[in-house]
């Protein structure tokens, strides 16, 4: 049970990090485009 919770948390953290990185890249490309 504990291992499942830990892996789930790692997946959630990785997802959030990827989401933030994607948004940052989008904003950066938009700023450079202008």
Curated annotation (Swiss-Prot):
Localisation per UniProt entry: Cell inner membrane
Source domain of life: Bacteria
GO cellular component: photosystem I; plasma membrane
Membrane topology reported for the UniProt record: Single-pass membrane protein
Summary of subunit composition and partner proteins: The G.violaceus PSI reaction center is composed of one copy each of PsaA,B,C,D,E,F,L,M and Z, and forms trimeric complexes.
Family the UniProt entry places it in: Belongs to the PsaM family.
Protein name: Photosystem I reaction center subunit XII
Organism: Gloeobacter violaceus (strain ATCC 29082 / PCC 7421)
Lineage of the organism: Bacteria, Bacillati, Cyanobacteriota, Cyanophyceae, Gloeobacterales
């Amino acid at each position: 049970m504990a291992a499942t919770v830990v892996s789930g948390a790692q997946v959630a953290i990785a997802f959030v990090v990827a989401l933030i990185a994607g948004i940052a890249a989008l904003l950066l490309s938009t700023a450079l485009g202008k």
